[in-house]
């Protein structure tokens, strides 16, 4: 199916109808209708004969050639005659169909109304797709149509009417160019379209509707053209491109379309099918397009035009102009040149502001479409990088027109975003100028002061527009730092940028700019902080810290300052600079080769004039030759090679100096060329290899090129050298022959079109701008490499590498950023701004900690701490503005009875509750502390601030002192006391009425107001949410020696009127905190010693209550147990406190859980290797135990300690402490004497016949005494090292309990003593040889004591029985003698008056005889045989022993239960 078949009416009919419409209109309105009626009839009615034979048709058609007929009308008639015979358009040339309409459009004598109708017809043809790909010559048709539209002419009438016609032209051009057929247009035609529409868009005399339509069309055409770059193959990447072209060939022509033409042109018509292409519109041959310029003679009247149309129609020829290639790179370059002409500084007076702005917008559109591909086409990229960018910089620096500046800045930022990596030099210079304007810094501009102190609105616009750089990419500053600041040849753009922002972000900068500038700059700083924070969120700090291999580029960055110093020295004096560069390692050695390589590769900071003077020095010939050899001139013309050469240095001024350089250059140039004599030819144009000059020829030619460059571009030269003059001067100079004509022509044109820039030629005078730009661009004249890698430098970095750059940036600007943020935070009145600032400061602290910038980290936190209003010094600090000034008020604690809550109201609480920033600071401050992971990062000042805040909150009753309840539980301590409020008030309701307030006033009541209570509540809620205790003490990284020492140092040592309210409570609070924290770092011995010393020192503070002293005792014993070998303090504790402060450490104290826990810890020290020996050998320790034992409540625990120690550790007893231990046991054994009271009572009750329901109230004491007696006896077991006096002491201790008032104890002691003497002592020993010694040393002292004499009847009998049994035991063993018996008889004789004792003596004698005779045992049985073994004794104290006690009620004796 044909493309035309989508319309209902066939295309032939549509065209015929349009012909009729045009014919009718022309007959009515054409000025040629003054002919006769018949002629008009015949002329308009020739269609009647269209179906007749050829003869008739020919006859009537010839009528149209009459000179009185309308030639335009005849064209339509002839077209109708042709179409009447056709069923479709397949066999007719498309151009033939369109020619009558195009002739109307391009003829100036036609009225605007007729032209409008022709445009409507053309619009219909293209809209309905009548001319399409299946049409014959459809390419020519489209090209002819566009050409006719761009040369549209008609008779003028009213402005609006004329513009409406042109509006149709614009729309039709847009529809064709935008359509797929637009790609078929040639370079010259597209360029005509651009010129035509752009001239309309820029003509302010046209109506606004037309101009707007033209502008939108230009944008659409721009998009269309530059989109084509995506399909055009780039140039050869290996080809060297020499920028030697002029940029000013293409200029915007006057708006001549339509009626705006000179009267003398009205009678002449341009080629209706657009065969003419003017020289000015020709595409440069350098673009690879050969244009054939066809000049047609202008017709002098309509008849001749008709002849041309008919001739062309009959021949159906293809005109050469339409055989050109489709448009591409050449017209793109021409278009950019055209746009450049609109914005170039030299044309600023030719074009209006609106035109220049529109030109900037179109360039921006082009960049937005294909900017990323421009570097693939050197000719296009050079336009952007040199003249266009130069114009941008010039406008930024000089204009005061806001709209123009805005458009320029938008284009600049687009260039930075898209081509930033390829335009570093230009961007550096531009940003430097922008910030010098913003900061009113004229040092960056050596010109006059006209550019200083720009209006505020200009500065606002500058900063608004460049803010897109960091808004679009938060990593902009990091990437800029990598590209510029880490480059030795570039300025510190990123750092200077950020430093400028820190100044401009301050509120006071609004005085020289506008109010909107500081927020915009601040956003830039915040974006940097946010970006760095995001970079490190997923990176482990330890992993980052383990990096050892620093990046080479950062090492270079660190040496940049040194490099600049060296280059400055070189620029001043090479003899001074080169040794410095060698010394610093920038130049490998002092060899000419190394020096040459350095100057070649690092010449951006070097003064090019200085380099030139150094190279041309007579003594530096070797250096010059080494330097020149570094260039590669192969395949280049001599002028191109010189251009490359002079990008590196400035040619000196003296002829001898120039000669040395040119001579070295000539030699090197010839060495680089691979000459082949067989290729030498004068006719091979464009083939440089056919021209092979020797060194002398190159020398002459080079010198001539330099002279030509000076002649053509020196404004003082009035008559410039012509090509004929130039070529004539070089006759016979090419190997004694002439240089080829074409070769010299290329050189001459190159120098004429593009000056060889000599850097620094205008330094310091009024041409500062040109000087700065020429210095910059001279090094980019030659493009030898096309960068296809468009990947951002940020994308190539690993996260760890990126952080290294962030660290380098933050090290430079971090303090400035933090200072700026704080300054803004201080004066900010908006809560949102305050929150944003403190959040950024929080991130800054994280970044500082991550990068280990300790000073900055501490500065941030100290400043935040001062802003909390909780530090005493903060009221005098600059941040005191964060809190309102509020007069002092007493600390009032209000208890609300209905809710059972307490609220402390104080000056600090109210101030804190009313300060939003204070609360904000507090929350952030402790959040930072909570996340800390570096135990060494906090400074002493910061710790002091932290402790001050904690103590302030504690003193104001806002912070609970019980931070370590586990420690209190472990030490059996009660909760810490809280400071006392100055006033306590109970309230039934939380609201207070007016009458109540007035009554309080009359009474002098200190009750706070509702507002103050509300503020205090806020304070408490904020402190609670800050979770201070967990933040500081819950993070082990925070628990350091510095914190502990700061806490102890903050303890007040003197009680006065100001601190009496909280003095002791705070002292305990600090000490308990210190000890709890020390548990986390108890391995630090010196710290433990310091704490112990400080606690002992504080415990001696005057005026401490007993409660405080007692609590400190617990702290001390814990500290001593944690520290190693602190016997000095342990001795002080026992001697100076436990023994001397009996009024404090009373029986009641040791009865408490705290006292019991203290004893346990004291006992545990005897198991410590550090204190065991000291305690066991310290008499005062045992004295203290005896003292505590006397308190009865603790006797059991002390016995348990002794029992456990003696039975599990045989080494506990020493010669030094044996008697102390024995005395302590005897003390415990004697405690059961109180059981005598129960025995007496029990006896009375039983004698009176009362039933006994209650138990023995002294049962525990009796049982403890029995256990102690048993333990005393145990001392003789497994202890063969006892001395005689120690054995006697044990026997005497047991014997002493035989006279215990409590019968149960005394009888048990008798049995134990007898068993001890019989079973646990072996005679003889080293110390004791006979039984007599045992009896005399152990038992006789008891018989002779006054206590024994008081109850002779019971005790003496018992003791004598023991003596008898012991004697008989040893008699059986054969260890007695007559002296032994005589000794015993003498003992009995003292008490023989007692009949019972006499009987015992008689029994003894009988038993002795029986043993001696070997008769076994006495018939009566000895007491020894009747006494059970002590190992079978069981102790039980249920009832007192009495002769009348029933056997069932008497206590049974068996083993003593071991604890």
UniProtKB/Swiss-Prot annotation:
Recorded superkingdom: Eukaryota
Pfam families xrefs: Sec7, Sec7-like_HUS
InterPro entries xref list: Mon2/Sec7/BIG1-like_HUS, Sec7_C_sf, Sec7_dom, Sec7_dom_sf
Keyword Cell cycle: no
Residues covered by the SEC7 domain: 570-714
Effect of deleting the gene: Exacerbates the cold sensitivity of a DRS2-knockout.
GO molecular-function terms, A-Z: guanyl-nucleotide exchange factor activity
SMART domains, alphabetized: Sec7
Primary localisation category: cytoplasm
Biased composition (Basic and acidic residues): 1447-1459
Alphabetical keyword list: Cytoplasm, Golgi apparatus, Guanine-nucleotide releasing factor, Membrane, Phosphoprotein
Cysteine disulfide partners in this protein: none
BP-aspect Gene Ontology terms: actin cytoskeleton organization; endoplasmic reticulum to Golgi vesicle-mediated transport; intra-Golgi vesicle-mediated transport; macroautophagy; regulation of ARF protein signal transduction; retrograde vesicle-mediated transport, Golgi to endoplasmic reticulum; secretory granule organization
Compartment(s) of residence: Cytoplasm, Cytosol; Membrane; Golgi apparatus membrane
Membrane topology of this protein: Peripheral membrane protein
Assigned GO CC terms: cytosol; Golgi cis cisterna; Golgi membrane
Region (Disordered): 1412-1459
Modified residues (Phosphoserine): 46, 284
Quaternary structure annotation from Swiss-Prot or TrEMBL: Interacts (via SEC7 domain) with DRS2 (via C-terminus); the interaction is direct. Interacts with GMH1.
Biological role stated in the UniProt entry: Activates the ARF proteins by exchanging bound GDP for free GTP. Plays a role in maintaining mitochondrial morphology. Stimulates DRS2 flippase activity.
Note: Present with 7700 molecules/cell in log phase SD medium.
Annotated protein name in UniProt: ARF guanine-nucleotide exchange factor 2
Source organism (scientific name): Saccharomyces cerevisiae (strain ATCC 204508 / S288c) (Baker's yeast)
């Amino acid at each position: 199916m044909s493309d035309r078949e989508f319309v209902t009416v066939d295309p032939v009919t549509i065209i015929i109808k349009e012909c009729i419409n045009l014919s009718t209109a022309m007959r009515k309105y054409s000025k040629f209708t003054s002919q006769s009626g018949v002629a008009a009839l015949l002329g308009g009615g020739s269609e009647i004969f269209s179906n007749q034979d050829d003869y008739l048709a020919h006859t009537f058609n010839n009528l149209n050639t009459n000179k009185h007929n309308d030639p335009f009308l005849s064209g339509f008639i002839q077209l109708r005659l042709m179409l009447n015979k056709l069923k479709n358009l397949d066999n007719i040339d498309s151009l033939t169909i369109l020619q009558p309409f195009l002739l109307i459009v391009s003829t100036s004598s036609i009225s605007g109304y007729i032209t409008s109708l022709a445009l409507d017809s053309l619009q219909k043809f293209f809209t309905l797709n009548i001319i399409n790909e299946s049409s014959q010559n459809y390419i020519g048709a489209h090209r002819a149509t566009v050409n006719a539209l761009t040369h549209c002419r008609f008779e003028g009438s009213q402005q609006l009417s004329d513009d409406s016609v042109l509006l149709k032209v614009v729309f039709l051009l847009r529809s064709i160019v935008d359509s797929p057929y637009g790609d078929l247009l040639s370079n010259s035609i597209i360029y005509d379209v651009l010129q035509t529409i752009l001239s309309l868009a820029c003509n302010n005399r046209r109506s606004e509707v037309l101009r707007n339509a033209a502008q939108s069309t230009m944008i659409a055409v721009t998009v269309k053209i530059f989109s084509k770059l995506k399909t055009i193959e780039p140039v050869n990447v290996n080809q060297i491109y020499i920028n030697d072209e002029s940029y000013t060939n293409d200029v915007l022509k006057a708006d001549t379309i339509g009626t705006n033409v000179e009267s003398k042109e009205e009678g002449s018509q341009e080629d209706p099918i657009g065969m003419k292409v003017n020289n000015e519109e020709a595409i440069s041959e350098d673009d690879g397009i050969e244009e054939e310029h066809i000049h047609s003679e202008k017709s002098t009247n309509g008849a001749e035009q008709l002849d041309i149309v008919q001739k062309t129609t009959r021949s159906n020829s293809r005109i050469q102009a339409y055989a050109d290639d489709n448009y591409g790179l050449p017209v793109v370059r021409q278009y950019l040149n055209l746009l450049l002409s609109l914005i170039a500084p030299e044309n600023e007076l030719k074009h209006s502001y609106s035109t220049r702005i529109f030109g900037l917008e179109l360039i921006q559109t082009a960049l937005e479409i294909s900017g990323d591909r421009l570097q693939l086409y050197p000719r296009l990229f050079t336009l952007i990088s040199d003249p266009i960018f130069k114009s941008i910089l010039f406008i930024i620096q000089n204009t005061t027109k806001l709209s123009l500046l805005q458009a320029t800045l938008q284009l600049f930022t687009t260039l930075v975003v898209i081509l930033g990596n390829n335009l570093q030099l230009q961007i550096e210079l531009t940003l430097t100028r922008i910030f010098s304007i913003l900061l009113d810094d004229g040092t960056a501009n050596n010109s006059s002061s006209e550019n200083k102190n720009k209006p505020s609105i200009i500065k606002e616009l500058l900063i608004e527009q460049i803010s897109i750089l960091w808004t679009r990419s938060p990593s902009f500053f990091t990437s800029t730092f990598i590209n510029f600041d880490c480059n030795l040849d570039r300025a510190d753009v990123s750092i200077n940028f950020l430093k400028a922002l820190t100044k401009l972000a301050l509120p006071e900068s609004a005085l020289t700019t506008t109010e909107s500038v500081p927020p915009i700059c601040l956003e830039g700083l915040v974006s940097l902080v946010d970006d760095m924070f995001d970079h490190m969120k997923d990176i482990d700090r330890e992993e980052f810290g383990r990096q050892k291999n620093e990046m080479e580029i950062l090492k270079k960055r660190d040496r940049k300052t040194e490099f600049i110093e060296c280059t400055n020295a070189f620029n001043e004096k090479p003899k001074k600079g080169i040794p410095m560069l060698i010394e610093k390692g920038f130049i490998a050695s002092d060899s000419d080769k190394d020096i040459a390589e350095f100057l070649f590769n690092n010449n951006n900071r070097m003064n090019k004039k200085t380099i030139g003077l150094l190279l041309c020095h007579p003594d530096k010939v070797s250096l010059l030759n080494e330097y020149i050899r570094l260039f590669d001139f192969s395949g280049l013309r001599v002028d191109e090679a010189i251009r490359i050469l002079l990008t590196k240095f400035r040619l000196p001024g003296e002829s001898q100096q120039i000669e040395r350089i040119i001579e070295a250059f000539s030699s090197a140039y010839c060495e680089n060329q691979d000459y082949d004599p067989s290729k030498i030819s004068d006719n091979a144009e464009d083939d440089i290899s056919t021209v092979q000059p020797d060194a002398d020829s190159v020398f002459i030619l080079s010198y001539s090129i330099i002279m030509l460059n000076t002649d053509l571009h020196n404004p003082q030269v009035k008559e410039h050298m012509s090509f004929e003059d130039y070529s004539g001067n070089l006759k016979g100079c090419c190997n004694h022959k002439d240089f080829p004509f074409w070769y010299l022509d290329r050189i001459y044109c190159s120098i004429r079109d593009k000056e060889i820039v000599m850097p620094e030629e205008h330094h310091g005078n009024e041409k500062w701008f040109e000087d700065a730009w020429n210095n910059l661009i001279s090094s980019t004249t030659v493009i030898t490499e096309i960068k296809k890698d468009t990947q951002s430098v940020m994308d190539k970095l690993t996260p760890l590498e990126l952080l290294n750059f962030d660290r380098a940036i933050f090290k430079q600007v971090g303090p400035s950023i933090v200072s700026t943020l704080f300054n803004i935070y201080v004066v900010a009145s908006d809560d949102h701004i305050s929150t944003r600032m403190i959040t950024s400061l929080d991130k800054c602290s994280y970044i500082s900690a991550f990068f280990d910038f300790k000073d900055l980290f501490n500065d941030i936190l100290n400043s935040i701490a001062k802003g909390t209003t909780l530090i005493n010094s903060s009221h005098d600090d600059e941040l005191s503005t964060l809190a309102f000034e509020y007069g002092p008020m007493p600390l009032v604690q209000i208890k609300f009875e209905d809710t059972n809550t307490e609220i402390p109201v104080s000056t600090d609480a109210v101030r804190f509750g009313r300060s939003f920033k204070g609360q904000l600071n507090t929350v952030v401050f402790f959040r930072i502390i909570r996340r800390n992971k570096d135990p060494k990062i906090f400074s002493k000042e910061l710790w002091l601030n932290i402790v001050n805040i904690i103590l302030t909150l504690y003193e104001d009753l806002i912070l609970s002192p019980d931070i370590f309840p586990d420690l209190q539980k472990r030490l059996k301590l009660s909760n810490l006391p809280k400071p006392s409020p100055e006033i306590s008030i109970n309230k039934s309701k939380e609201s207070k009425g007016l009458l109540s307030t007035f009554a309080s006033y009359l009474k002098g009541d200190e009750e706070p107001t509702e507002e103050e209570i509300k503020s205090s509540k806020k304070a408490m809620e904020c402190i609670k949410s800050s979770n201070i205790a967990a933040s500081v003490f819950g993070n082990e990284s925070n628990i350091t020696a510095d914190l502990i020492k700061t806490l102890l140092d903050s303890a007040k040592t003197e009680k006065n009127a100001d601190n009496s309210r909280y003095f002791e409570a705070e002292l305990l609070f600090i000490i308990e905190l210190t000890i709890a924290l020390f548990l986390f770092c108890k391995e630090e011995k010196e710290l433990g010693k310091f704490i112990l010393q400080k606690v002992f020192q504080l415990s001696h503070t005057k005026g401490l209550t007993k409660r405080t002293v007692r609590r400190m005792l617990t702290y001390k014993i814990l500290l001593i147990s944690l520290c190693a070998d602190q016997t000095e303090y342990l001795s002080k504790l026992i001697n100076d406190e436990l023994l001397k402060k009996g009024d404090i450490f009373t029986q009641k104290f040791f009865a408490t859980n705290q006292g019991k826990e203290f004893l346990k810890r004291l006992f545990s020290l005897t198991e410590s290797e550090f204190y065991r020996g000291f305690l066991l050998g310290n008499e005062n320790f045992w004295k203290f135990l005896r003292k505590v034992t006397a308190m009865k409540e603790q006797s059991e625990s002390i016995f348990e300690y002794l029992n456990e120690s003696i039975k599990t550790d045989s080494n506990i007893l020493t010669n030094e402490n044996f008697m102390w231990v024995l005395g302590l046991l005897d003390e415990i054994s004697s405690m059961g004497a109180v059981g005598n009271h129960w025995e007496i009572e029990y006896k009375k009750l039983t004698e009176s016949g009362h039933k006994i329901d209650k138990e023995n109230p002294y049962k525990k004491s009796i049982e403890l005494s029995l256990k102690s007696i048993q333990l005393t006896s145990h001392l003789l077991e497994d202890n063969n090292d006892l001395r005689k006096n120690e054995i006697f002491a044990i026997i005497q201790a047991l014997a002493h309990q035989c006279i215990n008032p409590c019968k149960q104890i005394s009888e048990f002691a008798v049995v134990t003593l007898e068993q001890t003497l019989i079973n646990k002592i072996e005679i003889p020993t080293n110390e004791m040889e006979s039984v007599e010694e045992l009896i005399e040393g152990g038992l006789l002292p008891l018989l002779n004591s006054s206590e024994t004499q008081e109850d002779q009847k019971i005790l003496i009998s018992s003791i004598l029985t023991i003596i008898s049994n012991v004697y008989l035991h040893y008699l059986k063993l054969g260890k007695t003698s007559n002296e032994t018996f005589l000794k015993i008889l003498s003992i009995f004789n003292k008490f023989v008056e007692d009949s019972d004792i006499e009987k015992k003596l008689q029994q003894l004698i009988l038993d002795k005889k029986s043993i001696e005779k070997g008769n076994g045992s006495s018939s009566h049985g000895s007491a020894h045989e009747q006494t059970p073994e002590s190992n079978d004794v069981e102790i039980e104290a249920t009832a007192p022993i009495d002769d009348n006690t029933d056997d069932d009620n008497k206590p049974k004796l068996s083993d003593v239960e071991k604890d």
